Amino acid sequence: MYDNLKSLGITNPDDIDRYSLRQEANNDILKIYFRKDKGEFFAKSVKFKYPRQRKTIVADNSGQGYKEINEISPNLRYVIDELDKICQQEQVEVDLKRKILDDLRHLESVVSHKITEIEADLEKLTKNR
């Protein structure tokens, strides 16, 4: 699993926190950030440079002109797919945690209101005696 990341020397893909991708001249720069350990001020990161792939394509439908374009390297595309799986999985976990906390707060509110209602009913019973 995560063979492309492992080929970059990343032995523990689960330690990845996030990544950034930018274009610089004819290169794509991938920066991978890892989770901070306790006591660290900055997250550890590694940077990789991928040359953009050059392609010559037909410029218009008449077939008379050609133009050269640059696009992302196929290897980088595979690495990004793996990074997206890791980072999106963490986002799903964060969303689930937030949902559970929201549900818990709602339950707390409902129970609190119900307790107040029951106490009021008890108060009515004791006043009628």
Swiss-Prot record:
* Stored Pfam families: DUF3461 (PF11944)
Alphabetized HAMAP family for the sequence: UPF0325
Can you tell me which family this protein belongs to? Belongs to the UPF0325 family.
Q: What is this protein called?
A: UPF0325 protein ECA1027
Q: Which organism is it from?
A: Pectobacterium atrosepticum (strain SCRI 1043 / ATCC BAA-672) (Erwinia carotovora subsp. atroseptica)
Q: What is the lineage of its organism?
A: Bacteria, Pseudomonadati, Pseudomonadota, Gammaproteobacteria, Enterobacterales
